[in-house]
């Protein structure tokens, strides 16, 4: 909250029934996709109620790489979320300003600034497909140094229909 207030923004908390829906009603072993959709839906609805039309996600370089790897493994396609996305159904623009910052760089900044991190209370945290992709990518990068950078280069220079030309090297 202190960082948000320092930037002139207001921290807002929204109570939902998402955990109940995902873990009690649905009971899927891998509930991440449904949970993400419900969280985004609730967030976009709340942004609309507050008259907010732009949000910055904290996706970092490692998130982009892991998403590309997950796409290849689980969907058979090469994809990563675009740096800027306009969601017409929500009237919201999503920006990802930290896409070139490694996760360790973000973590170091958080520590150096004394920013308090909210612990993830999800019951499947640490055993998700994303966590698997993260560990796999770390192993691949240890065995083949520079792989992360090459994958990020491929992501940035890939030809994704929803990526503007300006974000390509």
Regions found by a protein language model. Name each.
Residues 1-11:
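Single conserved hydrophobic/aromatic residue that forms the stacking wall/gate
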Residues 33-105, 151, 168:
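Active-site adenylate/phosphate-handling loop in enzymes that bind or generate adenylated species
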Residues 23-24, 79-169:
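ATP/NTP-dependent adenylation/nucleotidyl-transfer catalytic domains that generate, transfer
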Residues 16, 60-62, 122-123:
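Short, ordered loop/turn segments at secondary-structure junctions
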